[in-house]
């Protein structure tokens, strides 16, 4: 991001040769030259810097007061399109790994409140159930990076069975994004710390919005997320940090 925001996302079977003369893209098997497909990412240099914080984890915790309400601005047309399919077919399957799997678990309850019985699986346990997917299945794959191997395997198996694949993903241009029929980009920005914070809560907020779109109460969901952002403004500040530091010192 410091040098360019123009990228080509490599597909399976592609290789890049870098020389002083420039960049060339080739097919791994045939060695035939291919055209670069340039896309531009909207992340800024400061998004990938600590911004005065001692480490990325603290920065990303503090950013949630902005990233959660920002989710309320997610592509409304995509939400409506997915919600329409869910309301017609009423068959929702969600998969994810690690922290993202808790989003899927929580979303089961969001959808239940909207009258939809959704299922969730850890991606690495899904393959035996892939055969139950069909053209009436809305399959939601959740991943911060969009490159989680088990989630990709599950998504491919569901798509092969005829399911409509939705990606809830944070990183732009990922394999999952390219694989999916529809993408909900959560837009939390780069998450560099190993522990997921803002990406997790933004993914959770995205599924909350989708469930409310299904239930016909999207305006309420958007208001709730904006209100939560204002509440977090009062919590995630230097005063709180000072209290936490003092408490930690007392414990130690």
Task: Label the model's feature ranges.
Residues 1-86, 100, 109, 113-115, ...:
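N-terminal segments that mediate ammonia production and transfer
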Residues 84-233:
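Glycine-rich phosphate-binding loops that contact phosphosugars or nucleotide phosphates
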């Amino acid at each position: 991001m410091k040098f360019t925001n123009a990228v080509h996302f490599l597909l399976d079977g592609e290789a890049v040769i870098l020389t002083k003369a420039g960049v060339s893209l080739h097919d791994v098997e045939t060695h035939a030259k291919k055209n670069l497909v340039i896309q531009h990412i909207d992340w800024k240099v400061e998004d990938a810097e600590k911004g005065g914080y001692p480490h990325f984890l603290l920065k990303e915790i503090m950013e949630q007061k902005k990233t959660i309400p920002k989710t309320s601005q997610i592509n409304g047309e995509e939400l409506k399109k997915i919600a329409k399919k869910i309301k017609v077919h009423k068959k929702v399957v969600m998969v994810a790994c690690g922290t993202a799997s808790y989003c899927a678990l929580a979303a089961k309850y969001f959808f239940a409140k909207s009258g939809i019985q959704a299922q969730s699986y850890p991606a690495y346990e899904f393959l035996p159930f892939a055969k139950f997917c069909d053209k009436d299945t809305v399959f939601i794959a959740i991943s911060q990076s969009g490159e989680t191997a088990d989630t990709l395997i599950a998504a491919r198996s569901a798509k092969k069975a005829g399911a409509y694949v939705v990606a809830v993903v944070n990183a732009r241009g990922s394999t999952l994004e390219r694989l999916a029929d529809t993408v909900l980009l959560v837009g939390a920005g780069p998450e560099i710390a190993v522990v997921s914070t803002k990406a997790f809560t933004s993914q959770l907020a995205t599924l909350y919005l989708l469930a409310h779109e299904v239930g016909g109460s999207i305006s309420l969901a958007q208001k709730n997320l904006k209100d939560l952002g204002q509440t977090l403004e009062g919590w995630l500040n230097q005063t709180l940090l000072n209290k936490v530091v003092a408490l930690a010192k007392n414990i130690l």
